[in-house]
Amino acid sequence: MSKRFKFDSSEMIYLTDKLMNAASNRYSIVVQVARRAKRVRYDTVENIDDPMIKPVQRALMEMTDELTEPELLRD
């Protein structure tokens, strides 16, 4: 059984809050995170680059890193 990389829950809450505050529509950002997580999950099955991070956590990290480009948060 593989161990998952442990994230600090306060860090994940901070990233989520940061992403929600930057979005104009909460529903659309939740859908975008879900789609990104699904894509990340399928990419990790093929590439197996870092199976220790859950797909939703990786999606949140990637999307908060992309906050400097606001056009990525729109549909």
From Swiss-Prot:
It catalyses: RNA(n) + a ribonucleoside 5'-triphosphate = RNA(n+1) + diphosphate. GO terms for molecular function: DNA binding; DNA-directed RNA polymerase activity. Its EC number is 2.7.7.6. One of its GO terms (cellular component) is DNA-directed RNA polymerase complex. Disulfide bonds: none annotated. It is an enzyme of class 2 (transferase). Keywords: DNA-directed RNA polymerase, Nucleotidyltransferase, Transcription, Transferase. Belongs to the RNA polymerase subunit omega family. Promotes RNA polymerase assembly. Latches the N- and C-terminal regions of the beta' subunit thereby facilitating its interaction with the beta and alpha subunits. NCBIfam families: PRK00392.2-5. HAMAP family: RNApol_bact_RpoZ. This is DNA-directed RNA polymerase subunit omega.
